[in-house]
Amino acid sequence: LFDGLYISGNKEICDEYMGKYPVIFLSLKDVDGLKYENAKYRIMELIGREAERYFFLGDSDRLSENEKEQYKAVIALQNGKYSMDENVLTSSLRLLSHLLFQHYGEKTVILIDEYDVPLDKAFQNGYYQEMVSLIRGLFGMALKTNDSLQFAVLTGCLRISKESIFTGFNNFEVLSVLNVPYDESFGFTDNEVEKLLDDYTFSDHYPEVKEWYDGYHFGNTDIYCPWDVIRYCKSLCADL
């Protein structure tokens, strides 16, 4: 999958992390709804589908019968829809991480992308307090004092106050685009843009790309928007 890419050349990182831990991944970008119940169901659906990727847990000889029943409660359907009640939903990520730890003997990594979208949509549609309560419970159960958790990474655009949904979290670190150690991680650097243009024999277009798309300064680094640069290169290819 990563042959020829930069990450494949970093042997230490690959040896330490690649394929070593079970992973729970959720993207909350599509969690929306005019009413709380609609948005809550979208979260339920995402977690249910993620749990179904590990369908073998239902028959794992490393889980107790009670644990298998708990897993089945997360993926259970009623009239074709996931049927978790709010208590099961709130504990679902913690439970799934525990079951994966029991099955694999390795702690679980949890990755949650655009964690802030449900809260933003809830604020716009008038059910913010209900969504904050759900997210606080869901994240709190999964990420706080969870012995089955290796680590978790949450990404988002909005800075949600720690007091609203991350109350009492241990070893919680906020990293923004202003943090120097990660300032090259949120877009294309100048060197990467130069190499991209060179690979497509468009090096003579570098001055205009820099003028148009060199739009951000993160930490100590000038950063280009990847989408804009790629679209520009695509338009140049179309003109050949």
Q: At which residue positions do the language-model features occur?
A:
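Structural recognition of the conserved hydrophobic beta-strand(s) that form the central parallel beta-sheet
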Residues: 25, 109-113, 137, 150-157
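Conserved P-loop NTPase "ATPase switch" module shared by AAA+ and STAND
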Residues: 104-128
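P-loop NTPase motor core
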Residues: 2-56
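Substrate-engagement module of ASCE P-loop NTPases
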Residues: 51, 92-103, 130-150
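Short glycine-rich substrate-engagement loop in P-loop NTPases that contacts/grips substrate
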Residues: 79-97
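Short secondary-structure boundary/capping segments
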Residues: 40-43, 124-130, 164-179, 233-240
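Short regulatory helix/loop adjacent to the ATP-binding pocket of P-loop NTPases
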Residues: 36, 143-149, 158-178
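Amphipathic alpha-helical segments of the small helical/lid subdomains adjacent to P-loop NTPase cores
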Residues: 164-168, 175-233
